[in-house]
Amino acid sequence: MRFQCEIVTAPVSVRPVSRLSHDELRRRTLRRQFPSISGTGPEAVLELFQRLGPIQSQVPRAPFLTISSRLPGVRYQTVCELFESYQLVKTSNIRGTVHTSALEQFGWLDAVARTTRANQLRK
């Protein structure tokens, strides 16, 4: 199966790029890693993964620690239920290492990673 991408261009307005200070870059990086999400239920956990993207999970407790550090008060059982219902999945689709991602992300992650791995193996 081959995947084809079609690039669609649309007119865009270009804003002048401003140079960030090191402090502002640090603040923005931390803000991205610790998004402001309200709630501790399944929807909040899935939103967290939508914003963060896949997280490395070679260590079994890594997704639990990542979630609890960003959504204080989330229950262990909530995360387990998301894994049991396959809304969160652990796979090795990125660089051959184990990552946890939301099920919605898995399809495109796997397609991109599979194509990349196939190209690497052909070399």
Label each residue range with its predicted role.
Residues 3-123:
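Phosphate-backbone binding and catalysis cores of DNA-processing enzymes
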